[in-house]
Amino acid sequence: MNSADTQEPKSFNHTDMWTAFGTTMSGALETDPRAVVVLADIGAHLFKAAAIADPNRVINVGIREQLMMGVAGGLAMCGMRPVVHTVAAFLVERPLEQIKLNFAQQDVGAVLVSWGASYDLSEFAFSHFTPGDITVIDSMPNWTVHVPGHPQEAADLLLESLPGDGRVYLRLSSQVNRYPHAVRGTSFTPIKYGTRGVVLAVGPCLDAVLSATSMLDVTILYAATIRPFDATGLCAAVQAVNRPNVVLVEPYLAGTSAHQVSSSLVSHPHRLLSLGVRREMEDRHYGTPDDHDHIHGLDARSLSNSINSFLG
């Protein structure tokens, strides 16, 4: 098995994505005249200094998520670049109608930045769980979806998302990989090469996947951007292995990107195993994110069992 070239670890002061977002976005407010932050109370502490420096560039509407989307939509129609932030459940699910009407219907863009999906905020239990956020975003056309696995990637992808007028969803997590990898547009990053199949690891799942497959002769692809889906990269990886086995490991609902895999490989007979947050259960326990990873089979040991069984 040959290892692919990966990015050398960068010197980065932030150990979590939330802090990286606040620092990076505060810096962007100083240099980008179009950028404006819209909040629903959560995350306001990240922008105290920025709000004092320019109150018109940090707008906190209080716990009114529908209003937050309306304000952001209006700003976008005026030529600004709104960055909208709160907990994932309150960013994507609660104001879904306003997202559709204020952005998709008006054909304007924004950067929606979430925190806490799928079950990072386990201390608040089921009301704050959002394993279906990517599925919700997928129901609307023309969204770019970033799922970083490291604070440095989160910062890089945020800065990449600010220019232009596209619709972007940036999913921040408390779970992180040990090292960042280079953000290469929408292309998947090869981590290592093998012959028995291809494992696509999304965002913070990578370290567990690497541990689970350390003794397996498989190709590992890493995705920090999952929409648009890198069909070309996946096809090339599958064509290069001896067995067309594909394992998809996502930190949200299992099978969320299965249709993308099938469409990408429509001309290539293949087998697919989709791993992620289980759809057949609603786990309402508190616990920790690691506990929930184990329940849903996303810890390294469970992944190893599932992948080994699939490969045979």
From Swiss-Prot:
CDD domains: TPP_PYR_DXS_TK_like (cd07033). InterPro entries: PDH/Transketolase (IPR051157), THDP-binding (IPR029061), Transketo_C/PFOR_II (IPR009014), Transketolase-like_Pyr-bd (IPR005475). Induction: During the interaction with host plants. Residues 1-28 form the signal peptide. The keyword Signal applies. PANTHER family: PYRUVATE DEHYDROGENASE E1 COMPONENT, TRANSKETOLASE-LIKE PYRIMIDINE-BINDING DOMAIN-CONTAINING PROTEIN. The FAS-operon encodes genes involved in cytokinin production and in host plant fasciation (leafy gall). This is Uncharacterized 33.6 kDa protein in fasciation locus. The lineage of its organism: Bacteria, Bacillati, Actinomycetota, Actinomycetes, Mycobacteriales.
